[in-house]
Amino acid sequence: MNLPEYHRLAAYITSDHSQDYTQDTNVAFIEEGPWDGEEEELITSFSTVEDLYTAICVREDNNQLDMALKFAPFASEIELPFYTALSQLKIDHDKLDDSARPVLGLYEPRATQSPDQSSRMRVLGNALSSNEVPSGHIRAEGKIKNVNTIEDFKNMDKQAMLQTSAKQIWDAINDGTIYSIPSLLSSFTILSFANLKKYTFTYWFAFPALHSEPAWRKVEQPPKFSAEETTALTEELGTWRYSHDNREHGFFLAKRVYPSSEHPQDPESESTSDLPFKWVIGSLREFESGFFNGVDAKNQYVSFVDPSTYHENPGWMLRNLLVLVRRRYKLDKVQILCYRDNHAKRHVPQSLILILESIYDPEYQSTAPDQIPKVTGWERNSLGKLTAKVTNLAQYMDPAQLADQAVDLNLKLMKWRIAPELNLDAIKNTKCLLLGAGTLGTYVSRLLMGWGVRKITFVDNASVSFSNPVRQPLFDFKDCIDGGAKKAYRASEALQEIYPGVDSTGHVMAVPMLGHPITDEAATKMNFELLQKLIEDHDAIFLLMDTRESRWLPTVMGKAAGKIVMNAALGFDTYVVMRHGVTPEDGGPAALGCYFCNDVVAPSDSVKDQTLDQQCTVTRPGVAPEASSKLVELLASVLQHPLKGAAPAPKLSSNHQSGQLEFDRDPPNHPLGLVPHQIRGFLAAYKTMLISGPSYDCCSACSPKIVNAYKEDGWEFIKRALTEKDYITELSGLAEVQRKAEAAANDVEWDSDEEGMEDEEPELL
């Protein structure tokens, strides 16, 4: 094969038609090849066309590979607080809504870092709520789509998601809006799934990059700027940024302006440096208004802040900038400034300068001119694989913080779908005083914690006995040894062991009881004052003691202080759960009665002369937890009502569909349903009844006479009530009621006697 044939073959192959070549091709093409003399000698050393073809292809591929641009991709870097912020946003606001949300990304040139640690896209803890850009950083526009299930994450059409994100860049370039938001050129998208029970976060970043076709290639690589040039450029750029939106800071135009004899440099604006030119910075939009007019090509720079520290590889966002250069600027050759300097080290030049060229040939364009080009951008992991990343936040979190979030999680999930109007803070912030730390008190406290209540105080005077742990869930066997731990102290400690975030304390004291004479006035008064202070300091008072008389004083105090008073009492297979009525704001009588409103006698000593079965709380084991759960749920319902403790009892009305009487929900949108006054349970029949009882004006505990006397005289009133047997009965009016009842009974008996006499001895007329 003679030399001209080799020349023709070489020219044909290197003209991008090699895929059409066969040995029998007979085409008239140029006689001169692209090789010089030394290369001609090399060509003639091949004996066959096939060998030459292979050699030329390899040589050309290597040559193109050397001059082709390789871009340093972004790597994601998420601060731990961001995961917490994303969790809170999902739980408290987004719930089931998985619409994409804006997120702020940041990057910066880090000259001191190794190349593999550069090009970091940082997402700070406040990225979901803040647009603040720290000094030295460049902003990037991001979106995060936090889906509801891991299946949604796996099944997401990731190519379509990437295409949608890239189309936003493409459209902004074509319609010119990119000039207002140049930071869109470095935009990113996050697909994520937050497992809020296990505190694991699965996520995948995409940094959409539009491909240029044909690809841009390095024509040459000019030398770096001098230290003086870099210093002047950095100072001029810093001045320019002060007057421009931070979304423009990452992309700009730069030019060297030399003074001419026709236009000498203004002395006032003359640079203090010894450079023969002045740097001028402009926005990307200024290209179309003639920013580079009259400026030599070697002094024109289309620039971007480059986070890459690779010596020859620019940052990922240059891909999109080059698409803008071709689409908006109509350039096929451009000088790119990969700006890598910062103000602190402006005397050490780091920036990379590239002269790039891309010859547009419509014959070999794979897509239509107005069609979005090929898009890539999903992030690879440390092994170079296209796959998602998983972060386990539990290993970084303080266990107490984990417990805080876990306690609230189930409650907040109620608001996602079932009860969106539920006011959890109203329950969580309610300070609860539990009078009694026994069977009822221990169950109630656990259920209050389940509702998220953070402040629980116990009052009890007893110690843990060996019969308690099986029925009282806060105690165990070791609490019974050596006489038994005090219930109030041990119960509060147990709550903190269960959940360290609860504020629980215990007070060992005996509640002064009606019918029990004072044996130590100083101690009794001290207990009275402590109880009075505790009731003032709490919002909801639970009466969970063993006797009726022990509930009397807290009932009086709670009514006088306007507190929510919750009461539960147990029988063998029955229970009563109720809320006490509160005094209305107008000062009138309470609409609903208290625990004592149905009594016609004042409480008295009920433990005197009791046998063993009467001294112990003998109930079916399931009664206490059932009553406790009803009591806590009743409090939750009360706190959701607009009137809180003054909520009226539900009323019966006829259901138009069933024709049966049903209680009306008041208000109709109450998230938890009814707010009954009393619930009476009958375990033997497995039924409950909702009962409403009005307040009684002669009640020994909540009647105006009793409450007013307590408010006026305080301890003196209580002292007299405990020492004078019939004082409360007389003051409340119950004694008069009893006398009238006796008189009425006597009248009935007398009338019966008279009628009998008349029958025996009829009067003669």
From Swiss-Prot:
GO MF annotations in UniProt: Atg12 activating enzyme activity; Atg8 activating enzyme activity
Anything noted about its domains?
Answer: The C-terminal residues 721 to 760 are required for homodimerization, as well as the interactions with ATG3, ATG8 and ATG12; and the C-terminal 17 residues are required for the ATG8 lipidation.
Biological process according to GO: autophagosome assembly; autophagy of mitochondrion; cellular response to nitrogen starvation; piecemeal microautophagy of the nucleus; protein modification by small protein conjugation; protein transport
- Please summarize what the entry says happens upon disruption of the gene: Blocks the autophagic process. Leads to fewer aerial hyphae and slower mycelial growth rate and fails to produce any conidia. Also reduces the production of sclerotia in cold environment. Fails to infect wounded cucumber leaves and shows only slight virulence on wounded tomato and grape fruits.
Give one Pfam family: ATG7_N
Say where the protein is mainly found.
cytoplasm
Locus of motif GXGXXG motif:
436-441
Q: What does this protein do?
A: E1-like activating enzyme involved in the 2 ubiquitin-like systems required for cytoplasm to vacuole transport (Cvt) and autophagy. Activates ATG12 for its conjugation with ATG5 and ATG8 for its conjugation with phosphatidylethanolamine. Both systems are needed for the ATG8 association to Cvt vesicles and autophagosomes membranes. Autophagy is essential for maintenance of amino acid levels and protein synthesis under nitrogen starvation.
- Where are the residues of the annotated region Homodimerization? 721-760
Annotated GO CC locations: phagophore assembly site
Spell out the family assignment given in the record's similarity comment.
Belongs to the ATG7 family.
| Quaternary data | Homodimer. Interacts with ATG8 through a thioester bond between Cys-616 and the C-terminal Gly of ATG8 and with ATG12 through a thioester bond between Cys-616 and the C-terminal Gly of ATG12. Also interacts with ATG3.
Q: What is this protein called?
A: Ubiquitin-like modifier-activating enzyme atg7
| Ranges where the record places region Disordered | 646-670, 744-765
Q: Where is the composition biased (Acidic residues)?
A: 748-765
- Record localization: Cytoplasm; Preautophagosomal structure
Alphabetized UniProt keyword annotations: Autophagy, Cytoplasm, Protein transport, Transport, Ubl conjugation pathway
Q: Which InterPro entries match?
A: Atg7, Atg7_N, Atg7_N_1, Atg7_N_2, ThiF/MoeB/HesA, ThiF_NAD_FAD-bd, Ubiquitin-activating_enz
Which PANTHER family does the record associate with it? Answer: UBIQUITIN-ACTIVATING ENZYME E1, UBIQUITIN-LIKE MODIFIER-ACTIVATING ENZYME ATG7
Enzyme active site: C616 (glycyl thioester intermediate)
Query: Gene encoding it?
Result: atg7
